[in-house]
Amino acid sequence: MSANSSRVGQLLLQGSACIRWKQDVEGAVYHLANCLLLLGFMGGSGVYGCFYLFGFLSAGYLCCVLWGWFSACGLDIVLWSFLLAVVCLLQLAHLVYRLREDTLPEEFDLLYKTLCLPLQVPLQTYKEIVHCCEEQVLTLATEQTYAVEGETPINRLSLLLSGRVRVSQDGQFLHYIFPYQFMDSPEWESLQPSEEGVFQVTLTAETSCSYISWPRKSLHLLLTKERYISCLFSALLGYDISEKLYTLNDKLFAKFGLRFDIRLPSLYHVLGPTAADAGPESEKGDEEVCEPAVSPPQATPTSLQQTPPCSTPPATTNFPAPPTRARLSRPDSGILASRIPLQSYSQVISRGQAPLAPTHTPEL
């Protein structure tokens, strides 16, 4: 060991081993190769940084091959440069393959950026969800029905990608479904995995629509196996159902001029055609609800008394116009639950139809 170290020291002290230095510089290919290698080693991290790195290194080593073949005339220079260039090209090919493997169709990529990326869902987890629906995008033509009440079985869960879907029951409009909303989330949550049922509403496409659909059994298996995906779907479905409930609540406000509690049972019977079919009976019930809120008139002399505004009109063909009344205070939720839904419930039973939800529920 000491002999080798002393020999290296002698070589360093003696100076360069080159007998004669070349007077002319190397050709342009040699300098180009070194410039490309310098740029390549300045590459950053990440996928695009790797593309930058291996791209410049491949070009630099190929220039070294040309320089070793035409100028240096060294077989070892050619072989080593060629080997390094091949390794860099293989790395580039591997990166391209990985990118193509991770690429999703346009619809699913937009769905990921809109729905899952804000929740920081990993891309690999999203791919498992997409694989469950077989990466198929289904379509609906205008006025084509997705489900018919009382006929279509509940055997899938669908998410609308584009278009608009109308939800109705007995021909009465309930609400719309817009892109990136579930089309049948209430039906999905209403059944256990071992139960079967049919739709209680009709879903009709108002425009050309596209959607994705998960088979019920396949999705249940995925949710059972992956707890993270199960929690994700639970959050998405809960938010979707709450949005539909608030939509119905807003429609009630627009129709009756007061806001209903969304926890009231059988909101459909207030929205549905049964409330309109009640006619005078429903108006009479409304008056009965509102009358207790009006303060009784004060006692006045007989000569100064006027005809009360709510007196019974005479039985003539020309009915007087109803008197205008000030907007009353909002009635209690128990009164609303006992008046309007019960009238609709009796009419639905007389028609032989089952209500959407039980109308007799304990007071909260």
From Swiss-Prot:
GO terms for biological process: heart development; regulation of heart rate; regulation of membrane potential; skeletal muscle tissue development; striated muscle cell differentiation. It is found in: Membrane; Cell membrane, Sarcolemma. Glycans are attached at N4. Residues 276-333 are annotated as: Disordered. It is a multi-pass membrane protein. Expressed predominantly in the heart and in the skeletal muscle. The modification Phosphothreonine is found at T361. Keywords: Cell membrane, Glycoprotein, Membrane, Phosphoprotein, Transmembrane, Transmembrane helix. The keyword DNA-binding does not apply. The chain crosses the membrane at residues 37-57, 77-97. InterPro entries: cNMP-bd_dom_sf, POPDC1-3, POPDC1-3_dom. Residues 300-309 have a biased composition (Polar residues). This is Popeye domain-containing protein 2. It comes from Homo sapiens. The lineage of its organism: Eukaryota, Metazoa, Chordata, Craniata, Vertebrata. The gene is POPDC2.
